[in-house]
Amino acid sequence: MLEKLKNLNLVGSIVVLNDFFLDRIIKIQDLAGLYKQILEKTSLGGSIRGIPQFDIKGGNATNVAHALVKLGCPVSLITVADSTSSHILKETFSEFPKVSLFIIDGKPGRTTSLEFNNNGDIVNIMLSDLGDNENFGPDKLGSKEQVVLKKADAVIVTNWASNERATELSRFAFEKSKSALHFLDPADIQTRPGEFKEALSELGSDLDSLCINENECNILLGQYGLDTLADVDNTKKSVKELATRTSVSIDLHTSIGSCWSNGNDVEFVKSFPVQPKFVTGAGDVWDAANLVGYLANLEPAERLLFANGAASLYINSFQGIPPTIDQVLSLIKSAKTNTL
């Protein structure tokens, strides 16, 4: 694994599309207590104090791009922002010379992410204003963006579910990048499950990987009348069948582990044991490391292990900082040593 990652030499860049959000993370220690306080304030209003919160850059595409560049990859991020949020984007990536920003003028999204404990697991609920991410189509991509697509080593389109024109955008981006690997991460498709099933049939022949989490996978399994995820054996069976039905390789990440299948073969790799401190954006870090694994020609089990390691380091960070390749490899080496 080490040699393959060290020998990774990208001629072009990894192109990431297309969403940028300004995120506010609100950490809720006592959900029931907060709900009670809100009800008490509904008649006359007032303040509820002592709720920890902070602002970060967000959006699946922006998070994936940030994680990729931390892993040492050249990245071209195509997104939308206004003059104020453009400064935030530029500041975020200012220390990384391998990043090219293609910022289309428009309204960025805004998300308030509520993080709380649910039976020992940290979960998040995101309240979003989509901004101009909602209607980001091929017409947004000018000659400069099309040139970078043509030279790309890989292209990933994220947050399909929030973009009404995502299928159209994906088709255009993949057609303009014939020699690149193509990835799609749909995000939460709960409000558009049937439409996404149709999109997969349209885009499938150009897709190298569909990247989904447990919730998204269960929704998609339901569209094909397949069993939802349960234990490891069931997960492997369901993901393999889903890959067969869609004719697309599936890369799934869950809290217990990650799974890949191309419809013929299947692999499952358990997650690293970790106490989560930060969950918003963890799937984006997993996507980034998984993509790097593809480009480095890692075997499926190696690739899943590498992606799991990257995600575990991220969620174990209070600030949610994506790891470097060396940090991920060090974790994997340490874990293997401890199991001997």
Q: For each of these PLM feature ranges, what is it?
A:
Residues A61-T62, D284:
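Conserved glycosyltransferase catalytic-site signature
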Residues L68, N213, G283:
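Short, conserved phosphate/pyrophosphate- and ester-handling motifs at nucleotide-, phospho-/glycolipid
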Residues S43, R49-Q53:
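Active-site cofactor/substrate anionic-group-binding motifs, chiefly glycine-
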Residues N218-G222, P276-P300, L304-A310:
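Short, small-residue alpha-helix embedded
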Residues A311-I321:
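Short arginine-rich
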Residues A65, V69, L295:
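Gly/Ala-rich phosphate-binding loop of Rossmann-like dinucleotide-binding domains
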Residues M1-I38, P52-N60, P74-S76, A81-V266, ...:
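Ribokinase/PfkB-type carbohydrate-kinase core domain
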